[in-house]
């Protein structure tokens, strides 16, 4: 079995978007949890274009004497996964842990992830126990998890939980991928030799509201479908072929019925004909929309614009020099 050297340094990557209320508690609890590891550590917080006071608070935390905080400030909002990738580009640790800023996944779980990674796993995922979310969020999450499992064949139970640990070579492999539509847990699993999940606690959100609106969840679902596989396009072709055959058979049936019962019968069936026609037209629009999603993502990738733009990185001078040496 492949073995890895012991983890000497842990990097915690946290995307932040309008989380000024939770930041003091987040910084305190994360630093306390990392201090118990008995290893070097750093806490990278990426401000994803916040409109509140988050950027200033992160900058002050990073500039404080003896701080383990690194503030990565993006010029605008790029989304959770792009912000995390921006953080990945500045980590210096052997093991990288991602964590949400809303404190629903307690930072106190970090030592358990490090302990599990020490057993030789490339990726350590988590499954939220007693999940404190709305019925809509739970249902959407279950549907997305099943879709991912069927498409990828990777039987992991909770892809939506961002409390995860990745070995350094997994991070380097993901940074070499340049597609704009990225879902980090899935991308990481494509490079992992050994992956495992552990149960973790899930708390109610104490500060602010969820940043995932209904439309953001829909967009995430499209990202998942289009970045995972081209199977929907194949299904679309099969579905179109079935519809064409049914339409041809239905047309023959109408001709036979007209010959058998006369033109009066055909007039009485006009509403059913329109109903079937609208069904076919609706199916065509669904197919065109799905095809448009793929073409739009190809267009974005061909333009080769960066996934994010880092406006400023604030860290302690000694860690800054180490990061420069690594790069």
Curated annotation (Swiss-Prot):
CDD domains: DPM1_like_bac (cd04187)
Catalytic activity: UDP-4-deoxy-4-formamido-beta-L-arabinose + di-trans,octa-cis-undecaprenyl phosphate = 4-deoxy-4-formamido-alpha-L-arabinopyranosyl di-trans,octa-cis-undecaprenyl phosphate + UDP
Pathway annotation: Glycolipid biosynthesis; 4-amino-4-deoxy-alpha-L-arabinose undecaprenyl phosphate biosynthesis; 4-amino-4-deoxy-alpha-L-arabinose undecaprenyl phosphate from UDP-4-deoxy-4-formamido-beta-L-arabinose and undecaprenyl phosphate: step 1/2; Bacterial outer membrane biogenesis; lipopolysaccharide biosynthesis
Record keywords: Antibiotic resistance, Cell inner membrane, Cell membrane, Glycosyltransferase, Lipid A biosynthesis, Lipid biosynthesis, Lipid metabolism, Lipopolysaccharide biosynthesis, Membrane, Transferase, Transmembrane, Transmembrane helix
GO terms under cellular component: plasma membrane
Transmembrane segments: 236-256, 270-290
Main location: membrane
Enzyme Commission (EC) number: 2.4.2.53
UniProt GO molecular function: phosphotransferase activity, for other substituted phosphate groups; undecaprenyl-phosphate 4-deoxy-4-formamido-L-arabinose transferase activity
EC category name: transferase
Intracellular or extracellular location(s): Cell inner membrane
One GO BP annotation of this record: response to antibiotic
Membrane disposition: Multi-pass membrane protein
Highest taxon of source: Bacteria
Pfam family membership, one: Glycos_transf_2
HAMAP family cross-referenced by the UniProt entry: ArnC_transfer
Family: Belongs to the glycosyltransferase 2 family.
Function: Catalyzes the transfer of 4-deoxy-4-formamido-L-arabinose from UDP to undecaprenyl phosphate. The modified arabinose is attached to lipid A and is required for resistance to polymyxin and cationic antimicrobial peptides.
Name of the molecule in the record: Undecaprenyl-phosphate 4-deoxy-4-formamido-L-arabinose transferase
Organism field: Klebsiella pneumoniae (strain 342)
Lineage: Bacteria, Pseudomonadati, Pseudomonadota, Gammaproteobacteria, Enterobacterales
Gene behind the chain: arnC
């Amino acid at each position: 079995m492949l073995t890895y050297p012991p983890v000497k340094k842990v990097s915690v990557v946290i995307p932040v978007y309008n989380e000024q209320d939770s930041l003091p508690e987040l910084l305190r609890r994360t630093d306390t949890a990392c201090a118990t590891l008995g290893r070097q550590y750093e806490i990278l917080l990426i401000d994803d274009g916040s409109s509140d006071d988050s950027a200033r608070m992160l900058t002050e935390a990073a500039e404080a004497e003896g701080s383990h905080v690194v503030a990565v400030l993006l010029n605008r909002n790029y989304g959770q996964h792009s912000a995390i990738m921006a953080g990945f580009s500045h980590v210096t640790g052997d093991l990288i842990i991602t964590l949400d800023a809303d404190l629903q996944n307690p930072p106190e779980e970090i030592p358990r992830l490090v302990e599990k990674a020490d057993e030789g796993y490339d990726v350590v995922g988590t499954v939220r126990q007693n999940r404190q979310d709305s019925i809509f969020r739970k249902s959407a999450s279950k549907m997305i998890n099943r879709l991912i499992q069927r498409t990828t064949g990777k039987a992991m139970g909770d892809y939506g939980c961002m409390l995860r640990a990745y070995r350094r070579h997994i991070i380097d492999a993901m940074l070499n991928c340049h597609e704009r539509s990225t879902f980090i847990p899935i991308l990481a699993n494509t490079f992992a030799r050994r992956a495992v999940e552990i149960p973790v606690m899930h708390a109610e959100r104490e500060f602010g509201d969820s940043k995932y609106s209904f439309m953001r969840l829909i967009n995430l679902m499209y990202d998942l479908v289009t970045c995972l596989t081209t199977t929907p396009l194949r299904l679309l072709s099969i579905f179109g072929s079935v519809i064409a055959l049914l339409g041809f058979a239905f047309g023959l049936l109408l001709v036979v019925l007209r010959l058998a019962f006369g033109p009066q019968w055909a007039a009485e069936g006009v509403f059913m004909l329109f109903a079937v026609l609208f069904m076919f037209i609706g199916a065509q629009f669904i197919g065109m929309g799905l095809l448009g999603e793929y073409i739009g993502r190809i267009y974005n990738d061909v333009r080769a614009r960066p996934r994010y733009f880092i406006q400023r990185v604030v860290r302690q001078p000694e860690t800054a020099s180490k990061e420069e040496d690594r790069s």
